[in-house]
Amino acid sequence: KKGKEFFNSSMLIGPEGILGVYRKIHLNNNDRKWASEGNEWKYFDTKIGRIGMLIGYDAIFPESARCLGLYGCDLVLCSSAQEGIFTHGHSGTKVRQNYPIPTGPDPNHWNHFRIRGGENNIFFVYSNIIDIENNFHGKSGIFGPDPFKFPREECLISESENINHLEVDTTNLDT
């Protein structure tokens, strides 16, 4: 809250305490009922690299992560409460591929959060809530900067509450 305005915001917290606050820029229809738009892409320099932040609907727009990538972010964090099914599977292909490209089914083949990392040579962390009864299906994940590297550098959590991790190496993202 600032004055009489409310914002959909998230904080980046590190060992030193609060490193910064990001205010959501792209508001969906539900947000517009109570929140004002943020007006600045936020990123924070940390010991592990430059971290950018998005919230939910921001990540639908490729330009959001692109701006953070152009600001030199190594990692983008996106907290979300996105409803519905927004990833789709692929049944596989009979077309032969060079090793190690997989040809079998992939339930998360069409996942634009996976692509946000690859579009911008960044690690992309997407954290969504799980509440199946109210149409929140989770589909959280940590996605590496190269969607064409196999096996993929990623860690997915489907429709369950869980904690997962992926070792993130930001030392060579400039190439």
Can you describe what each PLM-predicted range is?
Residues 168-175:
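A short C-terminal boundary segment appended to hydrolase-like catalytic domains
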Residues 59-164:
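CN hydrolase (nitrilase-like) catalytic-core segments centered on the catalytic cysteine
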Residues 1-53, 118-162:
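Catalytic-core segment of enzymes that process non-peptidic bonds
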Residues 50-55, 76-78:
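Short hydrophobic-aromatic micro-motifs
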Residues 16, 58-59:
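Alpha-helix N-cap/helix-start capping motif
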